[in-house]
């Protein structure tokens, strides 16, 4: 029994320490002008407004918001319309990916980019999601360096240590799943 407890403790500590360094301290890519900004689904934590703000500043002329939310979602109703930016109009598209996953969002963006001849996109998500999103977009959007620019929603995460442990375990599992799935067809 003591061996089992020791193994569990080691796994939990290892998950927390490695997760802290890989996920909690994930870095943004330097912002570059892009064809579009894609907002990955998740919680309404300011990511929609942050992304539209980037577009208004001229970083892209189109914002694609992944919309896995139910009809009548008040945030989506507020943000799902074109706006005016410093460089002219900003197109806002709210689309439901065929699969409500990061992989589904990357595949949706690959199709949209091909249809619209886009070469570069900015991807917005949680800071701790960036490593996994970066891998999945390399697998399913483009493996070419510099084609996807990863940006975290600028916010502070007020999680308890136990909540962080769950976040890290979830991200590690998602990373393992993405590696196992490999490239999108």
Please describe what each predicted stretch is.
Residues 1-17:
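Hydrophobic membrane-insertion alpha-helices, especially the h-region
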Residues 17-165:
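A structural signal for short, hydrophobic/glycine-enriched beta-strand patches
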Residues 161-185:
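A transmembrane-helix-recognition feature enriched in membrane-embedded lipid enzymes
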């Amino acid at each position: 029994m003591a061996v089992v407890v020791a193994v569990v403790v080691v796994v939990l500590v290892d998950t927390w320490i490695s997760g802290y360094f890989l996920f909690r301290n994930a870095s943004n890519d330097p912002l570059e002008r892009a064809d579009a900004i894609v907002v990955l689904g998740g919680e309404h934590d300011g990511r929609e407004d942050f992304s539209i703000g980037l577009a208004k500043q001229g970083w892209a002329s189109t914002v694609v918001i992944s919309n896995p939310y139910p009809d009548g979602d008040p945030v989506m109703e507020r943000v799902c319309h074109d706006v005016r930016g410093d460089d002219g109009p900003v197109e806002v598209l709210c689309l439901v990916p065929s699969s409500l996953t990061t992989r589904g969002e990357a595949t949706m963006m690959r199709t949209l980019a091909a249809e619209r001849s886009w070469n570069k996109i900015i991807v917005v998500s949680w800071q701790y999601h960036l490593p996994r999103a970066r891998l999945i977009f390399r697998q399913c959007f483009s493996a070419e360096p510099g084609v996807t620019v990863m940006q975290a929603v600028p916010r502070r995460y007020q999680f308890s240590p136990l909540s962080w442990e769950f976040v890290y375990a979830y991200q590690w599992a998602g990373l393992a799943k993405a590696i196992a799935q490999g490239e999108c067809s």
